[in-house]
Amino acid sequence: MPRTQRNDNFIDKSFTVMADIILKILPTNNRSKEAFAYYRDGMSAQADGEYSEALENYEEALRLEDDPNDRSYILYNMGLIYASNGDHHKALELYHEAIDLNPRMPQALNNIAVVYHYQGEKAKQSGNEDESEALFDKAAEYWKQAIRIAPNNYIEAQNWLKTTGRSEMDVFF
């Protein structure tokens, strides 16, 4: 049964109804509409913690979607799933693919930085200072890019950049 027919959650149902209405009135081709339906079902499954189902829907949406911007969001959401399941290598790969398609996607830049920061912390805990500093520097570069695009976001990252001496004054303007 399609996910759209089994949403128990009021917000999910409301989103699904609105998305269906928008799909019907927007002048777009059937392939794009089908891609969006899979993307919507992927988001719903992801919100419910059904990651395998979400990935299946995202894969199908990716197969059908031609628009680079829309593809970037599909890849980004797939990256979120892999990151939450601890597969940081695959998450980074997907976030980078998303940025290749949409370079002004601050949330993907932020998540790349978060992964590098996490890896830096792990390297630091295992006593590898050089590796941890290199990973922290990578995190800093991606956070700076995200902050340049969305200067009012990522306050914790801005504070981390300042306290670790990795910020430059122009990064925030």
UniProtKB/Swiss-Prot annotation:
Annotated disulfide bonds: none
Main location: membrane
Alphabetically ordered keywords of this record: Membrane, Photosynthesis, Repeat, Thylakoid, TPR repeat
GO cellular component, one term: plasma membrane-derived thylakoid membrane
Subcellular localization(s) per the UniProt record: Cellular thylakoid membrane
GO biological process, one term: photosynthesis
Gene3D superfamilies per the UniProt record, alphabetical: Tetratricopeptide repeat domain
SUPFAM superfamilies on file: TPR-like (SSF48452)
Record's bilayer topology term: Peripheral membrane protein
Record's keyword annotation contains Thylakoid: yes
Family matches, as InterPro entries: PSI_Ycf3_assembly, TPR-like_helical_dom_sf, TPR_rpt, Ycf3/AcsC/BcsC/TPR_MFPF
Spans of repeat TPR: 35-68, 72-105, 120-153
PANTHER family: CELLULOSE SYNTHASE OPERON PROTEIN C (PTHR44943), TPR REPEAT-CONTAINING PROTEIN MJ0263 (PTHR44943:SF8)
Record function comment: Essential for the assembly of the photosystem I (PSI) complex. May act as a chaperone-like factor to guide the assembly of the PSI subunits.
HAMAP family according to UniProt: Ycf3
Entry-linked NCBIfam families: PRK02603.1
Entry's family note: Belongs to the Ycf3 family.
Protein name, as recorded: Photosystem I assembly protein Ycf3
Annotated source species: Picosynechococcus sp. (strain ATCC 27264 / PCC 7002 / PR-6)
Protein's gene: ycf3
